[in-house]
């Protein structure tokens, strides 16, 4: 009897959800912040924290599966891995930014910690 899947479905199929989270993670690595809904921010935080940890440990093949953009891949390994070398975890922070005017969805800004 399966009780919990351990992640939010976000109203999407598995492949669509995985692609969306990978694209959002790439955007966060490139721009260091993204504005999205709170639920998506909480899910993409897991992906980004895992990517930074893998980059710190030098596991580049697993990171290549997620990041398809060469610029983001290079920035992750050259800039972010050295920036967070001494930090054990918690590489992102989520700030709530109110409600979106169009559909009244709760919006959050997810940033990389300095």
From Swiss-Prot:
Keywords: Ribonucleoprotein, Ribosomal protein
GO terms under biological process: translation
Gene Ontology CC terms, in alphabetical order: large ribosomal subunit
Source taxon at top rank: Bacteria
Listed GO MF terms: structural constituent of ribosome
SUPFAM superfamilies: Prokaryotic ribosomal protein L17 (SSF64263)
UniProt KW Signal keyword: no
Assembly with partners or alone: Part of the 50S ribosomal subunit. Contacts protein L32.
Similarity field: Belongs to the bacterial ribosomal protein bL17 family.
Record-linked PANTHER family: LARGE RIBOSOMAL SUBUNIT PROTEIN BL17M, RIBOSOMAL PROTEIN L17
HAMAP family registered for this protein in UniProt: Ribosomal_bL17
Protein name: Large ribosomal subunit protein bL17
Gene it is expressed from: rplQ
């Amino acid at each position: 009897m399966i009780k919990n899947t351990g992640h939010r479905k976000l109203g999407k199929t598995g492949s669509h959800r995985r692609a969306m989270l990978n694209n959002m993670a790439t955007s966060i690595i490139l721009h260091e912040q993204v504005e999205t809904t709170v639920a998506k921010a909480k899910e993409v935080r897991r992906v980004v924290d895992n990517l930074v940890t893998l980059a710190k440990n030098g596991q580049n093949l697993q990171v290549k599966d997620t990041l398809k953009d060469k610029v983001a891949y290079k920035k992750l390994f050259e800039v972010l891995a050295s920036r967070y070398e001494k930090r054990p975890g918690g590489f992102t922070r989520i700030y709530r930014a109110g409600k979106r005017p169009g559909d009244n969805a709760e919006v959050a800004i997810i940033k990389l910690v300095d």
